Amino acid sequence: MTFRHCVAVDLGASSGRVMLARYDSKHRTLTLREIHRFVNCLQKTDGFDTWDIDSLEKDIRLGLKKVCNEGILIDSIGIDTWGVDYVLLDKQGQRVGLPVSYRDNRTTGIMPQALVQIGKSEIYRRSGIQFLPFNTIYQLRALTKQQPELTAQVAHALLMPDYFSYRLTGEMNWEYTNATTTQLVNINTDDWDDTLLAWTGAKKGWFGRPSHPGNVIGDWICPQGNRIPVVAVASHDTASAVIASPLANKHSAYLSSGTWSLMGFESKMPYTTDEALAANITNEGGAEGRYRVLKNIMGLWLLQRVLKERRITDLPALIAQTEALPACRFLINPNDDRFINPDDMRAEIQAACRETDQPVPVSDAELARCIFDSLALLYADILHELANLRGEKFTQLHIVGGGCQNALLNQLCADACGIRVMAGPVEASTLGNIGIQLMTLDELNNVDDFRQVISANYDLTTYIPNPDSEIARHVAQFQPKRQTKELCA
């Protein structure tokens, strides 16, 4: 078959898309077309920040039906989402309650309990995952302690992409790359860790053994009656994004830039040393047995909140105003946990500047400048941490995802990090999702083969560092800004 048509469902914390890919195996060309885009936002339910899971499923099905109604024969479907959140099911496979968002405050104070009762080193030795207060391990502990009556009804727990695959196929699956984000998978066995799971109060029977990307979960029957295989892709969106990052060699790092920024490198071995623990490095699962050694950064969430609060719709105009402002007048630590979900992001940023005896950003452009400068300096700091961890410097940084369209931030990143930045592709998560589908259909050999397809089909933008820039001169001064309560213990 010359042409393949694969559908990627890519759900982010603020929006979702159903994308159609067309792959010409003879010429190795790959094109994407957006079929359906929809909003994903939090809602308050019984005092919790929850996801409108039924609305998301409705939009997924609508997007799939749109493809089928065009007369296109779909070869496969794959679903990727954000990590750590889950859906509870009863014995009949029906949903129990609504999935609570990782941004809900129910996990406040839970992680310190684990550090005392299990031990930080022991948790890290078992999982290799960074300490974030909203990891699934702490969410489940909050669930079982705070809602025992709900817990009693539970027979299964599915992570978000696995739930949507289940709703399409009727088959349950626990995909490995996303499962590792829970901090509940043992890094040595690739299975759920009995000790960590027991601490949460959740039953091991809620979960099946994690499966690696590339297996067919089951079939979705389209309106025309065709059975379409649903593939377990690298269902954590960052895992998919890394697959589509055209990393040149071992000296290349990646930055998946969106609501969250995830900076790291690929490795065939995990890093679980005391140094890695001290730096709060995570070893999330990747495709083909690779590890995604990385750190979570709050990312463009801060900007998204400011845009929403200030009702700003013209982002390019705001960036143009921001670029005209002097650099580094206002600096914050974007990873300070005060920015996870404040009532008023603008006021929180201003308070952080005021508390550190800095000028206070007032205009929208000043707020954006504060966010961009601070992110770029944090990127540089973390890239330095990662280089020290592996004992080798990086020579190139690949920025992928929606954030790579921000030319100002890309240049600031290049200047602060002091290395060449390659930006693109924008639709990295979707493309990585498609890549695993094409491998499952035997159209591609492996991840490296797929990256050659990406390099041939998608243009990258290069940013050369300017060592004389204002932000480059502030790199050494930024470290004290990070002496705040970060997203870790």
From Swiss-Prot:
Keyword ATP-binding: yes
Binding positions (substrate): 83, 236-238, 296
Involved pathway(s): Carbohydrate degradation; L-rhamnose degradation; glycerone phosphate from L-rhamnose: step 2/3
A GO biological-process term: glycerol metabolic process
The protein's Enzyme Commission number: 2.7.1.5
Binding of ATP, residues: 13-17, 259, 304, 402
Keywords assigned by UniProt, alphabetized: ATP-binding, Disulfide bond, Kinase, Magnesium, Nucleotide-binding, Rhamnose metabolism, Transferase
Active site per the UniProt annotation: 237
UniProt GO molecular function: ATP binding; glycerol kinase activity; rhamnulokinase activity
Catalytic reactions on record: L-rhamnulose + ATP = L-rhamnulose 1-phosphate + ADP + H(+)
Disulfide bond sites: 68-222, 353-370, 413-417
UniProt GO cellular component terms: cytosol
Pfam family, one: FGGY_C
Statement: the UniProt record of this protein carries the keyword Ion transport: no
HAMAP family: Rhamnulokinase
NCBIfam families: PRK10640.1, rhamnulo_kin
Family indicated by similarity: Belongs to the rhamnulokinase family.
Functional note: Involved in the catabolism of L-rhamnose (6-deoxy-L-mannose). Catalyzes the transfer of the gamma-phosphate group from ATP to the 1-hydroxyl group of L-rhamnulose to yield L-rhamnulose 1-phosphate.
Name the record gives this protein: Rhamnulokinase
Lineage of producing organism: Bacteria, Pseudomonadati, Pseudomonadota, Gammaproteobacteria, Enterobacterales
